[in-house]
Amino acid sequence: MKPTRIVLFSAVLSGMIAFVAPTKNVARDVNIKSGNGTILKGTYFAAAKPGPGVLLFHQSNRTRKSWEDVARQLVAVGINALTVETDPNKTRKQRWPADLNAAFEFLISQPGANREVVGIGGAGVIGVEDSVETARGHSAEVKSLVLLSGETESLDFLRQASQLPELFVAADDDEYPPIVEAMELLYVTASSPSRKFVHYSASHEAPWLWYEPFDIGKVPAKGGHGTDMFKGHPELPGIIVDWFVTTLIKTPGHAPADTVASASVINQIQMPGGVAQVTQQLIEARRKDPEAQLFPEITASTIGQDHMRAGEPKSAVEVLKLVLLAYPESADANETLAEAYLPDGQKELARQHAEKALALLDSHRLPASSWTDTEQYRGEIRRGAEKILKQLTPGS
């Protein structure tokens, strides 16, 4: 049995995010005419070749320029970007839906912009509201959301968008409390198992002084709100770019399932009858989306391995069969299930899955698992599979 693998991922470790050098001479200022006659100021950043697009809304006390660094990094990795200027003095009824639709339609109408794969990012109360409302109005095209330091009344949309990848970011030193709690509400209301929360902690939250959208300048900026976080946390733009690369280029509309986001499913797996229930949920989810995932491979695999360590091979097999159903091309999942079949007396199945693990490793067609593909870990899987086959060889 392989030792327990505990991996802690921190979204705030800059070493995990590759820095993307900004690209020069890709931006042009544009005027976008809204359906209500309003002229929206914007800046369009064109990628060198066709690719997805990202629409970025700024917070009320900043301008579209606050997103420029992110936009340039997006262009460098092949993603078109549009930053748009919104009027913080306008009410939602005045902005929605005409201004939002105009910005969205401008983005997807640009040469080289994939109109079917779009991401949206927003900062502050107004930016987050505009982002969620735009995603609601264009749910078929919007494949990813990034929300910084805001809130929205559209909680029902986040609850219903069960497969929309969402990245939430907030900081305790945000000068407009209770933004952290508002962002946490958005996160716990959202139902996507691939959603993530980047939370910059402090010993105390900032004191409440005034509301964000009103009387701009009354509250001194402290660097903890919206795109202001980029200065104090220089890795954050890279985290956002990496998120859009994953959800718009590598696996459009999908991100790896997150343990915290899928906590209810993980807990359900550990309850009596839970494996069968989650198995059915996964089958139903796959009917709608063949790429749907309800839980991370390594987290559920650890539950199965815990059963093995407790001398409960039948329970281990039950859980690990679910893991393999979710991740059928994982050499790791095949080898771990083979380890469980062996003490359960199912020798032929143990042989089959050990051989499948080796075949997957030898093909070099896919990563060894969904969570890691290092040569060291591939070696661990290989040694485990070969050990099982040796144990099954007569006379060994």
Roles of regions detected by a PLM:
Residues E105-Q163:
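Primarily recognizes the serine-hydrolase "nucleophile elbow" in alpha/beta-hydrolase
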Residues T23-A47:
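N-terminal cap/lid segment of alpha/beta-hydrolase-fold proteins
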Residues S162, L167-A170:
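Short beta-strand/loop motif that positions the catalytic acidic residue
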Residues S66, K90-G112:
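Alpha/beta-hydrolase active-site loop
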Residues S194-Q268, Q376-G384:
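C-terminal catalytic histidine-bearing segment of alpha/beta-hydrolase fold enzymes
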Residues S60-A71, T86:
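The serine-hydrolase catalytic nucleophile loop
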Residues K49-G51, H58-R62:
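Active-site glycine-rich loops that stabilize anionic/oxyanionic intermediates
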Residues V75, V169-G217:
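Active-site-adjacent alpha-helix of alpha/beta-hydrolase-fold enzymes
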